[in-house]
């Protein structure tokens, strides 16, 4: 095996007691993605020989949630970071090197890791930081020449060592040829009663192997998550970085501090996004699109020159060019809108294709339907697509005029240029160019007197 072969071990077995959650800590999300999944993606970008993820607490939840091509290794007892890496040993190459990452350090990036790997070479690499407050973190101990000699955990540190501000981030590069021997010689004789991975630094020094420290360029890149406050802080840093990149690329964000991107955004020119917009999953937005305040959009494609008015929700849908959506509109999965479509307030569309120029401006439900072009839905139109057991399809042709407060009971077909009278319940097919009326005849009672409160029976 070539000396440069790279294995990566991601430690993700911890319970995360301070998260106060039944969910394993590493499944809590940053930018819409579980933390451990984000770390796996970063690791994969380094093109390693393999990636081993050590899991323990909540392993079934982790396996059910994270679908990545990695080697899963179970740590049945949580006996420390050194013990965790030891469980992965059977899956590591005899030669080369191993990079140790953490499933609760979600913002580590490939650039930092590449710098660390280059500095380490075939020896030991250590990522360090100098935070404003090092309390609770392992200190980097150096000799008089400035060489790293050990890492001392705060619970085991004396007053002099606690005064050191440079800390261990936990991210290490280790030579595989030495790893098994070093891990096998670890002791749990410390304040925690655990096998510390950090003790390998002293073992490397004792074996004459140089330790190459690399200071991270920004503390948040190596920051771990132990509670919901830290999770929220890293989420805001992540979102700020996303917003900055979009602004540099020409997207207008009315308030970058009130914008969330929880996925991937592909955008055209002159896109404008108002406050409190949440974008999730894979989003594609064309030129000159405007998204109003308080919209939530997930896995959607929006064509050029379309306007999404405030408080609209779009999910797993396609919107053509020059559309007007909302306010308070909802496009559910498999809604497919052609160009020049208007969908107004309190209109819901699900599993339906809508033809060019069609309008449903208010208070309408369109489900499991195929709708032609230039059709108009009057206010209060409902497609009754469910019989209590099965969903049924409705087909509506071109230039249909559906009166207000109509119910179309599926399965039913309306031909081209059909008109339905307001208040009709349409249960049978209607041929082209026909008028359909299906409502009770109005009756006016002459001489009727409305009862008033207090009238005696």
Residue ranges and their predicted role:
Residues 60, 68, 108-191:
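Conserved core of the sugar-phosphate nucleotidyltransferase
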Residues 1-7, 33-118:
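Conserved N-terminal catalytic core of the sugar/cofactor nucleotidyltransferase
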Residues 307-457:
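Glycine-rich hexapeptide-repeat left-handed beta-helix
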Residues 1-21:
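N-terminal nucleotide-binding beta1-loop-alpha1 segment
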Residues 206-313, 322-324:
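Extended, small-residue-rich solenoid/repeat segments and analogous flexible loops
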Residues 148-239, 244:
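Catalytic-core segments of class I nucleotidyltransferases/pyrophosphorylases
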Residues 168-172, 263, 392, 410:
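Glycine/small-residue-rich pyrophosphate-binding loop that anchors the diphosphate of NDP-sugar donors
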Residues 30, 101, 436:
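Catalytic metal- and UDP-sugar-binding loop of GT-A-like glycosyltransferases, i.e.
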């Amino acid at each position: 095996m070539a000396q440069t072969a790279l294995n990566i071990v991601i430690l993700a077995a911890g319970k995360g007691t301070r998260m106060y959650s039944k969910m394993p800590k590493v499944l809590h999300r940053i930018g819409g993605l579980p933390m451990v999944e984000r770390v796996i993606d970063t690791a994969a970008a380094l093109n390693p020989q393999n990636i081993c993820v050590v899991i323990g607490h909540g392993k079934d939840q982790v396996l059910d949630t994270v679908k990545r091509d990695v080697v899963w290794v179970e740590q049945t007892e949580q006996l420390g970071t050194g013990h965790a890496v030891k469980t992965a040993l059977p899956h590591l190459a005899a030669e080369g090197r191993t990079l140790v990452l953490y499933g609760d350090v979600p913002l580590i990036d490939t650039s930092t890791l590449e710098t660390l790997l280059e500095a380490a070479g075939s020896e030991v690499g250590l990522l360090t930081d100098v935070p404003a407050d090092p309390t609770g973190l392992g200190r980097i101990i150096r000799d008089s020449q400035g060489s790293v000699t050990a890492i001392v955990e705060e619970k085991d540190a004396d007053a002099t060592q606690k005064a050191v501000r440079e800390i261990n981030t936990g991210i290490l590069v280790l030579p595989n040829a030495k790893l098994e021997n070093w891990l096998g010689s670890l002791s749990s004789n410390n304040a925690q009663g655990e096998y510390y991975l950090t003790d390998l630094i002293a073992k490397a020094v004792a074996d004459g192997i140089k330790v190459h420290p690399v200071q991270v360029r920004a503390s948040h890149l190596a920051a771990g998550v132990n509670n919901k406050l830290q999770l929220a802080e890293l989420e805001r840093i992540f979102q700020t970085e996303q917003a900055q990149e979009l602004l540099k690329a020409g997207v207008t964000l009315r308030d970058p501090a009130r914008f969330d991107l929880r996925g991937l955004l592909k955008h055209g020119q002159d896109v404008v996004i108002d406050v409190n917009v949440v974008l999730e999953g894979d989003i594609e937005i064309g030129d000159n699109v405007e998204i109003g305040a308080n919209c939530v959009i997930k896995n959607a494609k929006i064509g050029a020159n379309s306007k999404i008015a405030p408080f609209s929700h779009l999910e797993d849908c396609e919107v053509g060019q020059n559309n007007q959506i909302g306010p308070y509109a909802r496009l559910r999965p498999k809604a497919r809108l052609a160009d020049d479509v208007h969908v107004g307030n309190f209109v819901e569309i699900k599993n339906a294709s809508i033809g060019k120029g069609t309008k449903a401006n208010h208070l309408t439900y369109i489900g499991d339907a195929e709708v032609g072009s230039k059709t108009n839905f009057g206010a209060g139109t409902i497609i009754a697509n469910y019989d209590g057991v099965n969903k049924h399809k409705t087909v509506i042709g071109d230039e249909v005029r559906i009166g207000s407060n109509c119910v179309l009971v599926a399965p039913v077909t309306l031909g081209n240029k059909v008109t339905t009278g307001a208040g009709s319940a349409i249960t049978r097919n209607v041929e082209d160019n026909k008028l359909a009326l299906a409502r009770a005849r109005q009756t006016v009672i002459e001489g009727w007197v409305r009862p008033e409160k207090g009238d005696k029976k």
